[in-house]
Amino acid sequence: MRTDIRKDLEPTSGDLVMAGVKGLASTVPFVAELLDVVFSSPLEKRKEEWLIQLADGLEKLRKQVGEQKLENLADNEEFQTIVLDATNIAMRTHQEAKRKALCNACINTAKEIDISEDKKLVFVRLIDQLTDMDLKLLLYFENPLKRFEEKGETINTSGFGMGGLTTGIYRYYPELKGQDEFVANRIKNLYSLGLMNTESINTVMTLNGIYEPRLTDLGVEFISFIKENA
């Protein structure tokens, strides 16, 4: 399906010209500093990593569905738009969860996931608004008990116990302990976006309630679009 994209990312004549411009500008500290920010090698590295991540995802998909299923992607305008939007966002973030979500959005578009084009466009741009923590919380609340099972841990919800949503959150993400105010802020934001059906982390509930899925139908669609699907 593709040659090794790493070879295509070797420096071009344009890259060499830019290097020359930066060399000339080095005698003017302010200009040199500005160019370092805009055209720095970390940004090039970020671009290369994103393109390789996307190419590897498409190659994995090709092996799953076959060459013929993907041969029309180059003419698929919806796919092109999603990839362009995702690429623009990927260049502005270093957060791995966001870049993975963007890549999955592209791959799921190529797989013709059953979500309307308008929703796909909204969902990709929504990734740009959300934080790494937001995405983690959404993935957890899609199905808390399943998330624990994936970690090899079984939660017994038949016993007696009470608590709030943070009981499960902090058990699954212990690194979030002590961040009650920020976690509450992010959940409230996800609720305002229509992705979660619960606004407060302070409501006391049973064990069943603590580990219930908490996404709205829109939230479920969003997660299905941005996660890796078999």
Regions found by a protein language model. Give the residues of each.
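Long, helix-rich, hydrophobic modules that act as membrane-proximal anchors or helical bundle/coiled-coil regulators
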Residues: 100-230
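Short runs of predominantly hydrophobic/aromatic residues within well-ordered alpha helices
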Residues: 17, 21-24, 31, 35, ...
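Surface-exposed polar/charged interaction patches
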Residues: 41, 61-64, 68-71, 89, ...
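Membrane-inserting effector segments that mediate pore formation, membrane fusion
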Residues: 2-58
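Non-transmembrane, amphipathic alpha-helical segments
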Residues: 9, 16, 20, 39, ...
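Amphipathic, membrane-active segments
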Residues: 42-85
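N-terminal leader segment of winged-helix/HTH proteins
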Residues: 80-111
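Residues that form generic nucleotide/phosphate-binding pockets
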Residues: 24, 57, 64, 105, ...
